[in-house]
Amino acid sequence: MNLPAKYRVLVITLSDRAHRGEYEDLSGPAIRQRIEEFMKSEGWEFSIDLALIPDDTAELEKLVKSASPVYDLIFTTGGTGIGPRDITVEIVRPLLSKEIPGIMEYIRVKYGAEKPNALLSRGIAGITGKSLIYTLPGSVKAVDEYMTEILRTLKHTLLMFHGIDSHLKNQ
C-alpha cells in the first residue's frame, strides 16, 4: 500500500457556546496549526477543514460518518469530559473498527501525574472507516499537550494504518 498523495484532515470543534458565537473557538485552530507544522515538516501535501458544531449527538454522528470515507485524519476537540453535555466519546466509540487506547492512556497518565484533573478526560483514538480519529479535550492547553504526544507517533501510526512496515530498512 502507499501513503496518500495528499492528506485530508478534518478538525471538529464541539462547543455549544462557541457555536452560538458567545466566544471564539481557539482549540480547533490550535489543532490546525500543529497539524500544518507537522505535515510541512514531513514534506507532505495536505488540506485541513474546520467544523464547529454544538454538543449534539446526531450532528456529531452524522459528521463523523460522512467524513470517515473521505478524510485520512479526524480530530475532535471538546466533549471528552464528564459533564452532562460531553458526548464525544459515546458517539465516536461505537463507530470505531479498532480502538488505539495506548496513546490516550499515556497522555492521561503523563499529564495527570502533575495535574490530577487531566485524568478526567475520556478522549479516545482509533480507526473509523478510512480515517484515524483522535478525540481531544476542549481547552487550548490540553490540545497542546495532546498534540505534542500524538504527533510524536503520528508518522508511524499513518505508516501502519496504510500497511507499510516502517521497520524494514528498504522503506
What feature does the model see in each segment?
Residues 1-171:
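Non-catalytic beta/alpha edge segments that cap or flank active sites
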